Amino acid sequence: MADQIAISVLGAGSYGSALAISLARNGHPTLLWGHDPAHVAELEHDRCNKAFLPDVPFPADLQLTADLQRAVQAAPVLLLVVPSHVFGQVLSQVKPFLRPDTRIAWATKGLEPDSGRLLQDVARDVLGETIPLAVISGPTFAKELAAGLPTAISVASTHDDFADELSHLLHCGRSFRVYTNPDFVGLQLGGAVKNVIAIGAGLSDGLGFGANARTALITRGLVEMQRLGAALGADAKTFMGMAGLGDLVLTCTDNQSRNRRFGLALGAGKAVETAMAEIGQVVEGYRNTKEVHLLAARCGVEMPICEQIFQVLYQGKNPKEAAIALLSRDKRDE
């Protein structure tokens, strides 16, 4: 495998910028694409992402562009870091410019809006069956990754050699450890469900329920994640790894998590719209909650925590009433 592999990162938000910074530091020719020319011009002028990562300058050789055709054709590996609700749209825009050797990965954590389908199914609908696909997932906050603090993630792919290639691209012995995992479905699912549970953890803390309640919610949330995974053929061990337990604990316990902060605001009595506006960035868990609800219903899987969060967000249920509904469920074996 060549030491250097060109890669284009599609999505110049906080996480896309952090991944591009890490890849460029690793010595790989890296191009960061953003959809808004004015924003990209600002990034180029400042040579940092002032909005999200103001203390981390871009490496000198990190290139930027708002030209999607240039980004797609500049590298054989594309890494999508875009919100889940525009994932299919971006793939459709990318498709006309694909190279014969293109491989596509994503760091997006979520499901298809209005259907709850896995992003792999969206990608196959748009791109067909031949292009190698991969997903990276795990406990990563953009600020810490960009700052070079120790971080570990997992990568899964439809093609083992592509998983190995991404591991080579991302892995940095000083700070960034990358595990490969054969469970393509499990890695996608873990990233979506943990966003929902993180909102629940924030709600619990916002209501003042304390550490006992938060820990119980995380633990039973993991059970719901495993239950849905089993229905979709995922490996239960995946949910005890980086993309499951790791990401779940991170986003449920640290206030860098937008989903947790969103839940905290709701628990403090703020309306959904107000809480979203205060975050000021995409809260993936809001949409993920509806998507997981749809997927669980389609699979016939019981997910009581996710269901109560859905009712709070989309049906106006009082958060305290949702907590009571969970605690008053019939007794059962663990």
Swiss-Prot record:
Task: Please tell me whether the keyword Methyltransferase is annotated for this protein.
Answer: no
Any one annotated GO CC term = cytosol
Which keywords annotate this record? Answer: Cytoplasm, Lipid biosynthesis, Lipid metabolism, NAD, NADP, Nucleotide-binding, Oxidoreductase, Phospholipid biosynthesis, Phospholipid metabolism
The entry's NADPH-binding residues are: 14-15, 35, 109, 142, 258, 282, 284
The record's section on Gene3D superfamilies has: N-(1-d-carboxylethyl)-l-norvaline Dehydrogenase, domain 2, NAD(P)-binding Rossmann-like Domain
Q: List, in alphabetical order, the Gene Ontology terms for molecular function in this entry.
A: glycerol-3-phosphate dehydrogenase [NAD(P)+] activity; NAD binding
SUPFAM superfamilies listed in its UniProt record? 6-phosphogluconate dehydrogenase C-terminal domain-like (SSF48179), NAD(P)-binding Rossmann-fold domains (SSF51735)
- Give the reaction(s) catalysed: sn-glycerol 3-phosphate + NAD(+) = dihydroxyacetone phosphate + NADH + H(+); sn-glycerol 3-phosphate + NADP(+) = dihydroxyacetone phosphate + NADPH + H(+)
List locations, semicolon-separated.
Cytoplasm
Example GO biological process:
carbohydrate metabolic process
Superkingdom, according to UniProt? Bacteria
Main location, first listed in the record: cytoplasm
Q: Which residues bind sn-glycerol 3-phosphate?
A: 109, 138, 140, 194, 247, 257-259
Q: Which family does it belong to?
A: Belongs to the NAD-dependent glycerol-3-phosphate dehydrogenase family.
InterPro entries per record: 6-PGluconate_DH-like_C_sf, 6PGD_dom2, G3P_DH_NAD-dep, G3P_DH_NAD-dep_C, G3P_DH_NAD-dep_N, NAD(P)-bd_dom_sf
Q: Where is the active site?
A: 194 (proton acceptor)
Question: Annotated pathway, please?
Answer: Membrane lipid metabolism; glycerophospholipid metabolism
Q: What is this protein called?
A: Glycerol-3-phosphate dehydrogenase [NAD(P)+]
Function according to Swiss-Prot or TrEMBL:
Catalyzes the reduction of the glycolytic intermediate dihydroxyacetone phosphate (DHAP) to sn-glycerol 3-phosphate (G3P), the key precursor for phospholipid synthesis.
UniProt-listed Enzyme Commission number(s): 1.1.1.94
